[in-house]
Regions:
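Juxtamembrane intracellular "pre-TM" segments in multi-pass secondary transporters
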Residues: 2-14, 190-223
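Short amphipathic helix-loop junctions that connect adjacent transmembrane helices
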Residues: 36-50, 236-252
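Residue-level signature of mid-helix packing/kink "hotspots" within the transmembrane helices
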Residues: 61-69, 151-152, 261-269
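Conserved MFS/SLC helix-loop-helix module at the cytosolic interface between two early adjacent transmembrane helices
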Residues: 66-102
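Helix-to-loop junctions at the C-terminal end of transmembrane segments
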Residues: 68-78, 266-280
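Cytoplasmic membrane-interface "Motif A"-like loop-to-helix N-cap segments
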Residues: 77-87, 276-289
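Cytoplasmic helix-loop-helix junction between adjacent transmembrane helices
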Residues: 109-148
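C-terminal membrane-cytosol helix-exit motif in multi-pass small-molecule transporters
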Residues: 176-195
């Protein structure tokens, strides 16, 4: 038995946070690896146009956004694990569909199906079930770090895998990562000793519409939406610009992304330290946007 008021995470909490962070990392790694390569390698697909390639890149977000809340509600009723298993299986099926596609429409269909495996809400809810309230922020920070790391790794590994195995091989690797995530859930994620119904979950369902209309949240959601739109648009335009304007072969794009990530990471550290010490993170954020 662990002390419910302990300042340290218990072994079970650490295991839960680490294993769920790993599940998130493998899923997001598979999702992110496609971004830097689809615009260039996707031109070989039948019917491919810049607009349809852009749709293929961002299509997963449509179904993911639509199903995130329903999957979370379903996980409250039938349990977190069945929803997570199902979501990862759907994600793997979408990757397999895209891997076997000969046309851009097949890839779009696969990406839409991938997005339908919207397990983020269920994973975060399971994390809440397995951690005490005072340690929840640390556990969620571990998941946030895993997502950031998976993005950085994907920018390098995605182009390298595609160069070696083609776009089809990349999607098969993505499917394998989803299945590996299912294995991690089966063998590493602790089981909750009892079904926990968080009071805040019930309140959130009752106040769903007022929450969606909240002005502060609307501004936050709009800002995040614009940020993601710019990111997706960048991966439509930048790879093609590197080929057409920069004369850089698509097989060599990985080192451009690696260099940009390293410069961005080490360049931001002093500003983050400054913002934390001077309590001017808003100013730092605005400067980063500019």
């Amino acid at each position: 038995m662990h002390d419910p008021h302990s300042d340290r995470m218990s072994a079970g909490e650490t295991r839960a946070a680490a294993s769920l962070a790993l599940v998130f990392a493998f899923r997001m790694l598979g999702m992110f690896m496609v971004l830097p390569v689809l615009a260039t390698y996707g031109t070989d697909l039948a019917g491919a146009t810049p607009a349809l390639i852009g749709l293929a890149i961002g299509a997963y977000g449509l179904t993911q956004a639509a199903l995130q809340i329903p999957f979370g509600v379903i996980s409250d009723r039938i349990g977190r694990l069945p929803v997570i298993y199902f979501g990862l299986l759907v994600f793997a099926a979408g990757a397999a569909l895209a891997a076997n596609a000969d046309s851009i429409w097949g890839v779009i269909a696969g990406r839409v199906l991938q997005g339908a495996g919207a397990i983020s809400a269920a994973v975060m809810a399971l994390l809440s079930d397995l951690t005490r309230e005072q340690h929840r922020t640390k556990a969620m920070a571990m998941i946030g770090m895993s997502i950031g790391l998976s993005f950085a790794v994907a920018m390098v590994v995605g182009p390298l895998l595609t160069r070696a195995f083609g776009l089809s091989g990349l999607f098969w690797a993505t499917a394998g990562m989803a299945l590996l995530g299912m294995l991690i859930v089966a063998v590493a994620v602790p089981r909750a000793s009892r079904s926990l119904q968080h009071r805040e979950s019930g309140v959130a369902r009752q106040a769903l519409l007022p929450t969606l209309r909240n002005g502060e949240l609307l501004r936050l959601n709009l800002g995040i939406g614009v940020l993601h739109a710019i990111l997706m648009a960048s991966f439509v335009a930048l790879p093609l610009a590197l080929v057409d304007e920069g004369g850089l072969a698509k097989e060599e794009h990985w080192w451009v992304y690696l260099s940009a990530l390293l410069i961005g990471f080490f360049g931001m550290v002093p500003f983050i330290i400054y913002g934390e010490k001077k309590r001017r993170m808003k100013r730092v954020l605005c400067g980063a946007v500019l």
